[in-house]
From Swiss-Prot:
It is found in: Cytoplasm. Catalyzes the hydrolysis of inorganic pyrophosphate (PPi) forming two phosphate ions. Homohexamer. This is Inorganic pyrophosphatase. Keywords: Cytoplasm, Hydrolase, Magnesium, Metal-binding. It catalyses: diphosphate + H2O = 2 phosphate + H(+). The gene is ppa. Pfam families: Pyrophosphatase (PF00719). Its main location: cytoplasm. GO terms for cellular component: cytoplasm. It comes from Methanosarcina mazei (strain ATCC BAA-159 / DSM 3647 / Goe1 / Go1 / JCM 11833 / OCM 88) (Methanosarcina frisia). Its cofactor is Mg(2+).
Length: 169
């Protein structure tokens, strides 16, 4: 088996929150963006991989399975395990599912097959419905395996590096 990949995730939104926080690149702070219009809460900690660029122009999204929620601005070393393939009004919007490297309640999980099936359904349902009352369309295509997640992470890192090179010219 290949060695487990360790990545860094910056948390914007803790599990159980209806508040949508976003990282403000210019000010280098976490800002309150809005409260979700629906009476549902984030099913896991949510943030992004620093120094990445996803297809939607933002850093690549990450979800981290935690026993207890963390806080906006918390940095966690994680192992990717899968990817939720979806699209929103800005286009493709992949989200990488991760487990904390140093949490014995979750870090045994290496692949999507080890994630509790009902939890995957809850996460899918959240992303299918969380923008309904805003009248924004979201399409969830389904879960993808670890290899797909790794590929998308590497592509987002490469895209970020390329953009940084171009902006320095």
């Amino acid at each position: 088996m290949t060695e487990r990949q360790v990545e860094c995730v910056l948390i914007e939104i803790p599990q159980g929150s209806r508040n949508k926080y976003e990282y403000d690149k210019e000010r280098k702070v976490i800002r309150f963006d809005r409260m979700l219009f629906s009476s549902i809460v984030y099913p896991c900690d949510y943030g992004f991989f620093p120094d990445t660029l996803a297809l939607d122009g933002d850093p690549l999204d990450a979800m981290v399975l935690m026993w207890e929620p963390t806080f906006p601005g918390c940095v966690i070393d994680v192992h990717p395990v899968a990817m939720l393939d979806m699209e929103d009004d800005k286009g493709r919007d992949e989200k990488i599912l991760c487990v904390p490297q140093r949490d014995p309640l979750w870090n045994y999980i290496k692949t999507i097959e080890q994630v509790p099936p009902h939890l995957l359904k809850e996460i899918t349902h959240f992303f299918e419905t969380y923008k309904n009352l805003e009248r924004k369309d979201v399409v969830v295509y389904g879960w993808r395996d670890l290899e797909t997640a790794r590929k998308v992470i590497q592509e987002a890192k490469d895209r970020y590096t390329e953009q940084k090179k171009l902006s320095n010219q």
